[in-house]
Amino acid sequence: MSDNRTKVRLLQKQVWRKGLVSIRVTKPEGFTFTPGQFVRLGLDIEANGKTEYAARGYSLASVPSDPFLEFFIVEVPNGLVSPRLCALEAGSELWLETDL
């Protein structure tokens, strides 16, 4: 697990078609990046009475001057993270890992 995790909040979700969404999340103070750079989005997942952390890599679709971070998420059938990301609603919290 990354030591450089930051909680972010889902601002907006756009469903483009079944299995494809874009999400916009809060941009951490001072966060800089290059367009197309990969980061990891993670969730605390409840399973079998325990909470486990899982994350996957995603490419930033926003530009550095945007006040938010945007990602396109393709849902992987039976995946651990992408179906949960696609199901999130505005206001939900998730983790951003930036030390890739």
Question: Model-flagged regions — what are they?
Answer:
Residues 95:
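Low-complexity, rRNA-contacting terminal tracts
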Residues 98-100:
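A short, basic/flexible loop-to-alpha-helix module at the beginning of a structural domain
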